[in-house]
């Protein structure tokens, strides 16, 4: 027999592991028997194979279902298939062939390798067992009686990392009931009820956040602040029975999420300090609530306190059980201890204990109650589990079946009270266990301490399972109460059964669809609302939002805008109203208070900005994406000026203010951004001027990053959009810009004027390269300086920012300005500029 060892690949379609799928060999018929069978024709073999495949597909349809987020061990599924073949008297296919058959039925099924190194197993991801299947209870042990039921599969592989509340950071509460769905009296304002429920949900979210941060002491302050600081106009609502019952429903939702967050259902080990903090929190919770409800209507405390007590009791019970499970787990893994326990329990005469007077007394009316024979059989099963070196999870699975068979199911069959049946079971279970411990004491059992620990663990879980059943009944009463007040029963069920979400976890119930729940903070924002970096790297393309409005006066920003109805990514996300007209105190560099020496700013419009690395990665959209640019700040708009308003470059001299010692940056980073577009009627923008724009800057053209920059009249009047290129001539310089920190808050309203020309930063002395000087343009020249002799210049200004380099060059290179103007202007300008080696080399010699 050959054993196939798998690689670490996760997406395996046909391979099997060495430990999983060997059972099919048991079904192989002896070779001699096969020789005696009549040989089938090829057509008959194909026909039988096709028939068996159809039967297998139908069997898969009857027993399994697509279930997003569920993992099922591949060996278990193959074992089910072998059982099916045995019952149907079919020759089972190998695991590889069976894997292909599964994918015929579930084409989207994937395979994952889960578990620690050396103990990993392959799992089918995205498939689950139907509850109607005969295999459901054998794998999941039913739905389980507690949160810890069914954790066997989750813990398979032996995860040992301790539980941390930091893994729950970002957990959000599900939706609370809405006043729009409540049946209220006409005198009750739905607006006030909605306000009160919204306030209470915020209050509950604060409690949850502080619990996750292990800041339990602060929770008392939140309780006092909310209830004792209730606004006067909302106080009458606290006397309304419907509103109080809705508070109880909200409390139940909060307690469910708190329990899920504080206590891991996978029975991970928890730090002792965290367990102590949770116990202390449970100890004080009821007192904190009663203190916060003083001087408020009595109906509040009458309804809220019983629910709080159930929550506290459940929290204490679960922490106690989890603590005992952590202590008992090493004992159950110790083979010497387990062997000693088995030897000691074998010396106990269980029949003599069962025949004692208390257990032998029966009532004719309650003849179906838990008897002494049941006690003996249960403890016999316990001995068998110890012999099999069962884990804590196996004991839980066994106890679930015991409580289900001995308490819950008989109560449902004969209509008797579950509480009465549970009381009888607990009485006889405790008595039988005490007599077993009595015998161990008399026999001087060496494993008495270990057995006492195991017994405490079993007792605690049985109490937890029964209490959970009682709590579930109370939860059902709240559900019925909510349905009574809701207009739609479906709405009440959706609200009450909603699961907590996480802002760091995607919604698994609806993959690929953005959640409509406003309380759910998705891990990835909806693609309809924002332009993510991944989308930006793929280019805007045809999905770019096209703005058709040509009237800039009709476009205003009032508060936070909602772009949820758009079907394509937007360039900017909504901005907070508080940030719209607030100046920045972060980006105030040396140019912050400089008087205006360039063109004046036109009408100002608040503009949202992105960090520079995002815009460096954006590809240019197709032309015509942003006609008229009416949705942007004036510095990014197409600006049309009359002939008299244009600035001829030859008619103006550049002052030294244009060459300051600070960097200038647009709101998108340190790279120069164009301050204006050439208007449709402006013919001054010629091809040679366009050559000043290179793909490394934020050009206006649609270039895809060619190394030679823009070629041709790419900045003509037909291209009215703001684009950027992802191509950069100098890769090291690109990395330098990406590594720089770009502050989140940028100056929005009080835009400070800067010089009409950006500086060329060269911390690595790249511009000193003679081979680069021969080029007709430089990558770092701002697009604001794209002018030719005799052409007009559009009014533009940029936002100043601190220089991102240690020692920026305060002046432009002479060679940088050579393509801009004629010989006369160059000579006049050179008289006011220092030599290039003085700027970049620190030399005091004259110009080269």
UniProtKB/Swiss-Prot annotation:
Disruption phenotype: Impaired endocrine cell differentiation and accumulation of islet progenitor cells. Expressed in progenitors and hormone expressing cells of the islet lineage. One of its GO terms (biological process) is pancreatic A cell differentiation. Coiled coil: none annotated. Keywords: Developmental protein, Differentiation, DNA-binding, Nucleus, Transcription, Transcription regulation. Belongs to the RFX family. This is DNA-binding protein RFX6. It comes from Danio rerio. The lineage of its organism: Eukaryota, Metazoa, Chordata, Craniata, Vertebrata.
């Amino acid at each position: 027999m050959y054993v196939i060892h798998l690689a670490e690949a996760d997406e395996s379609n046909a391979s099997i592991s060495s430990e999983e799928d060997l059972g099919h060999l048991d079904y192989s018929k002896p070779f001699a028997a096969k020789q005696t069978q009549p040989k089938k024709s090829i057509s008959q073999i194909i026909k039988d194979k096709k028939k068996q495949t159809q039967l297998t597909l139908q069997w898969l349809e009857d027993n399994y279902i697509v279930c997003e987020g569920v993992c099922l061990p591949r060996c278990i599924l193959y074992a089910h298939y072998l059982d099916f073949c045995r019952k149907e008297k079919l020759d089972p296919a190998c695991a590889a062939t069976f894997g292909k058959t599964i994918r015929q039925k579930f084409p989207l099924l994937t395979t994952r390798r889960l578990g620690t190194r050396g103990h990993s197993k392959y799992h089918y991801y995205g498939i689950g067992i139907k509850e109607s299947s005969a295999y459901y209870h054998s794998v999941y042990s039913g739905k389980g009686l507690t949160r810890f039921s069914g954790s066997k599969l989750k813990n398979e592989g032996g995860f040992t990392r301790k539980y941390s509340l930091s893994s729950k950071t970002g957990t959000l509460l599900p939706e609370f009931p809405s006043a729009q769905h409540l049946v209220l009296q006409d005198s009750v304002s739905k607006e006030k009820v909605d306000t009160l429920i919204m306030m209470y949900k915020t209050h509950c979210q604060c409690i949850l956040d502080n619990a996750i941060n292990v800041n339990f002491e602060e929770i008392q302050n939140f309780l006092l602040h909310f209830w004792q600081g209730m606004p006067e106009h909302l106080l009458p609502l606290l006397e309304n029975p419907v509103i109080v019952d809705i508070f109880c429903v909200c409390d139940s939702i909060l307690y469910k999420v708190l329990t899920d967050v504080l206590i891991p259902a996978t029975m991970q080990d928890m730090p002792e300090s965290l367990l102590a903090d949770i116990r202390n929190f449970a100890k004080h919770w009821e007192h904190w609530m009663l203190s916060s409800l003083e001087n408020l209507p009595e109906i509040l405390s009458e309804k809220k306190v019983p629910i709080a007590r159930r929550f506290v009791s459940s929290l204490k019970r679960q922490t106690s059980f989890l603590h005992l499970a952590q202590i008992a787990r090493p004992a159950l893994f110790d083979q010497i201890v387990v062997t000693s326990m088995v030897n000691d329990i074998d010396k106990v005469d269980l029949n003599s204990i069962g025949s004692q007077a208390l257990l032998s007394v029966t009532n004719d009316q309650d003849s179906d109650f838990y008897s002494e024979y049941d006690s003996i059989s249960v403890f016999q099963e316990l001995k068998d589990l110890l012999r099999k070196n069962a884990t804590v999870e196996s004991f839980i699975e066994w106890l679930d079946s015991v409580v289900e068979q001995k308490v819950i199911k008989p109560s449902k069959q004969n209509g008797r009270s579950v509480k009465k049946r549970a009381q009888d079971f607990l009485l006889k279970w405790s008595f039988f266990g005490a007599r077993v411990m009595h015998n161990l004491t008399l026999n001087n059992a060496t494993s008495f301490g270990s057995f006492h620990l195991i017994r405490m663990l079993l007792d605690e879980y049985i109490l937890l399972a029964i209490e959970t059943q009682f709590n579930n009944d109370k939860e059902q009463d709240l559900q019925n109460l909510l349905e009574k007040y809701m207009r739609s029963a479906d709405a009440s069920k959706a609200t009450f059964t909603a699961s907590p979400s996480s802002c760091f976890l995607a919604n698994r119930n609806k993959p690929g669809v953005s959640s409509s729940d406003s309380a759910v903070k998705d891990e990835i924002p909806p693609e309809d609302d924002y332009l993510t970096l991944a989308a930006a790297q793929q280019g805007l393309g045809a999905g770019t939002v096209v703005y058709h409005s040509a009237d800039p006066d009709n476009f205003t920003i009032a508060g936070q805008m909602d772009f949820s109805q758009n079907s394509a990514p937007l360039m900017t996300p909504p901005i907070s109203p508080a940030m719209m007209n607030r100046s920045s105190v972060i980006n105030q560099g040396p140019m912050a208070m400089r008087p205006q020496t360039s063109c004046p700013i036109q009408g100002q419009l608040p503009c949202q900005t992105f960090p520079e690395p995002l815009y460096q990665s954006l590809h240019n959209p197709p032309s015509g994406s942003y006609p008229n640019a009416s949705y942007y700040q004036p510095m990014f708009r197409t600006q049309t000026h009359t002939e008299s308003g244009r600035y001829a470059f030859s008619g103006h001299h550049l002052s030294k203010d244009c060459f300051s010692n600070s960097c200038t940056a647009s709101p998108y980073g340190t790279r120069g951004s164009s301050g204006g577009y050439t208007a449709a009627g402006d013919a001054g923008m010629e091809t040679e001027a366009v050559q000043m724009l290179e793909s490394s800057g934020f050009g206006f053209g649609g270039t895809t990053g060619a190394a030679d920059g823009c070629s041709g009249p790419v900045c003509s009047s037909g291209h009215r959009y703001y684009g950027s290129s992802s191509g950069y001539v100098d890769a090291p310089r690109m990395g330098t810009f990406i590594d720089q920190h770009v502050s989140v808050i940028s100056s929005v309203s009080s835009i400070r004027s800067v010089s009409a020309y950006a500086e060329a930063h060269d911390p690595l002395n790249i511009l000193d390269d003679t081979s680069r000087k021969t080029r007709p343009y430089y990558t770092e020249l701002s697009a604001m300086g794209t002018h030719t002799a005799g052409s007009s210049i559009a009014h533009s200004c940029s936002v100043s920012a601190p220089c991102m380099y240690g020692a920026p060059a305060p002046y432009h290179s002479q060679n940088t300005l050579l393509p801009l103007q004629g010989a006369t202007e160059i000579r006049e300008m050179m008289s006011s500029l220092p030599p290039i080696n003085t700027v970049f080399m620190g030399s005091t010699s004259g110009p080269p």
